[in-house]
Amino acid sequence: MIDFSRVKNYYIRCGYTDMRKQIDGLVAPVQLEYRQEMNEESLFLFCGRRSDRIKALYWDGTGHVLLYKRLSEKRFQWPRNREELKLLTQQEFRWLMEGLSIEQTKAFKPGKPGSVC
C-alpha cells in the first residue's frame, strides 16, 4: 500500500528527463548527481519535453514505486531553466498538480511581522 501521508519532501528535476527511463534510470541521477537517498519521506518528479506527462518515484520502505501521469489536455508548468533538483513546498506541489506554475507571482509571499508603534 502506498502511504503518501509520509511524504514531506517533494523534489522536481528541473529541465527535461528522457521519459523512456524506468526506475533504475531515474534513481541513478537522484543518487549520483544530486546525492539524495531514496526514503519514505521523499517523492521525486520528472517531466519530459512534451510536458504532458510526468513520472514520480517513491520508496515505500520495501521497494521503489514508479507512478506515471499523462494529461489528456494541457501541459504541466515545469521549470526548464536549469538542470537541478528543486525542493518544493506542499503548496508548490499542489500548484504543479493543478496545472499552475510553482513560481506564482501573485501569491502572497511570507513576510516578517512589523512593529505596532
Regions found by a protein language model. Name each.
Residues 1-117:
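Polybasic/polar functional segments that serve as interface/processing modules
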